[in-house]
């Protein structure tokens, strides 16, 4: 589980390659990265205390957001996105006991 957040200011791009262990996973439908946007396009991010939120703040924040995409957690799938002030994303809680979410993350930072 990774709560709703945007990435650090100096991160330019994130790339992820997923490696699900299909022998051990019953259902990986909710394992991919979820991406969110504001319901109101005029909403300002500076109204919120933190860009990395605990579960309580994240829950309140999500009242103003809507999920517009969740990447499929499929073998050898590459996804990527550019960091913006509004590039909110999270990983849902995995309810399967002893599950392992394997991926390679490649992040490019600027100074």
Please give the residue ranges for each predicted region:
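Catalytic core of non-heme Fe(II) oxygenases with the double-stranded beta-helix
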Residues: 1-110
């Amino acid at each position: 589980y990774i709560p709703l957040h945007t990435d650090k200011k100096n991160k330019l791009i994130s790339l992820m390659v997923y490696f699900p262990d299909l022998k051990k996973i019953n259902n990986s439908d909710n394992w991919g990265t979820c991406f969110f946007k504001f319901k109101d396009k005029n909403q300002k991010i500076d109204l919120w205390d933190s860009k990395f939120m605990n579960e309580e703040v994240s829950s309140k924040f999500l009242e103003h957001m809507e999920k517009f995409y969740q990447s499929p957690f499929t073998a050898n799938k590459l996804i990527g996105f550019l960091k913006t002030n509004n590039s909110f994303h999270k990983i849902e809680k995995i309810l399967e006991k002893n599950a392992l979410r394997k991926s390679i993350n490649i992040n490019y930072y600027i100074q």
